[in-house]
Amino acid sequence: MTPQFNECAQLTGNMDKAVNALYDCLIANENPLNRMIDMQRQLQIELAQRHPKYNRDPRELKTCGEILDWCQAQDDYIADEIREHYTALGGMSNPKPNAIWKPWRAEHAEYRNRLFSELSPEDQLEAKFELIDQIHFVLNKIIAMGMDGDEIFKLYYLKNAENFARQENGY
């Protein structure tokens, strides 16, 4: 049985809205990553209000233990989205898309060797949207840590430079 996914490729019908939102950020000299963090925070607040038994308002996370529990839950959700992403790379319009990550499937080599560019545009978008689903949960972890886009950039910049230095030093 093929796993059921949200079919997100059709969301691109609203691409003009997304492009306009990006332009609005840039025109306002706003960091688009900060806008994404704010959008995700608002979603989590809404979920906490609608379904308080299973969702928390990230603004209420105060202790290291609460943040740990939150991050562990996000990692569980990411793990699910990772598997969906792997399956989507098999092409959701194909009869056995999970053959790409199941080496015991007869179609395994065929699916692994298929060029991404050979997938239909819709299948390519599904794979990309599954990756975006993971970003939602990474953003939740960022929110829990109280980070913004500027801090993320600066810390990433420093860590990336360190990673290059390590490689130059035989790491």
State where each predicted segment sits:
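Flexible "arm" and connector segments at domain edges
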Residues: 1-171
